[in-house]
């Protein structure tokens, strides 16, 4: 939704106590700007921000590029501060984007729990999220940003691949 969910005084505790315990952090551009304490306007800025975030103790950082303009959206995976790969996706014209960040990180976690490597887990999670966004793009639920359709293909959630 774009709303800040953490109070300012909690940020230091998050950075010093929780972030070093994480295997993967999945900030969007505004969140990465806060964590890296720098403005992000291009790919070079993303690289510098990811290096700064990794220095805080997190091995993997997936900076999500959904806030950049354009028809194609690119997410960047860094391992130990170095660009490992990028993931390209399309922009979907919808107001139903509430929870996309949480859905992506939860899907990645579920694929990691199924013993997939980080790259495969992220790729599979992005495929799942894209399907959920497309399946829910025209739903009308409540006011403002609506949710993605998490149950667009339930069989895929329960079968081992």
Residue ranges and their predicted role:
Residues 83-98:
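Short pre-catalytic strand/loop immediately N-terminal to key active-site residues, enriched for Gly-Thr
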Residues 4-84:
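Conserved phosphate/ATP/ADP-binding segment of small-molecule kinases
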Residues 34, 94-118:
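Short, small-residue alpha-helix embedded
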Residues 83-85, 111-125:
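Phosphate-handling active-site elements
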Residues 119-161:
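Charged C-terminal helix
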Residues 67, 98, 150:
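Histidine-centered active-site/metal-ligand motif
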Residues 31, 66-69, 90-93, 126-129:
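Glycine-rich beta-alpha junction loops
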């Amino acid at each position: 939704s774009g709303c800040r969910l953490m109070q300012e005084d909690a940020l230091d505790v998050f950075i010093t106590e929780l972030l070093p315990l994480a295997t993967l952090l999945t900030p969007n551009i505004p969140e990465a700007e806060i964590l890296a304490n720098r403005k992000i306007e291009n790919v070079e800025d993303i690289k510098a921000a990811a290096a700064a975030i990794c220095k805080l103790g997190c091995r993997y950082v997936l900076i999500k590029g959904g806030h950049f303009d354009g028809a194609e959206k690119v997410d960047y995976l860094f391992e130990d501060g170095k660009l490992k790969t990028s993931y390209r996706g399309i922009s979907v014209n919808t107001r139903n984007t509430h929870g996309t960040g949480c859905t992506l990180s939860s899907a990645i976690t579920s694929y990691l729990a199924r013993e997939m490597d980080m790259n495969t887990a992220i790729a599979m999670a992005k495929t799942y999220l894209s399907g959920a966004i497309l399946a829910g793009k025209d739903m009308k639920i409540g006011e403002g940003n609506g949710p993605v359709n998490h149950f667009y293909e339930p069989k895929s959630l329960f079968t081992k691949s």
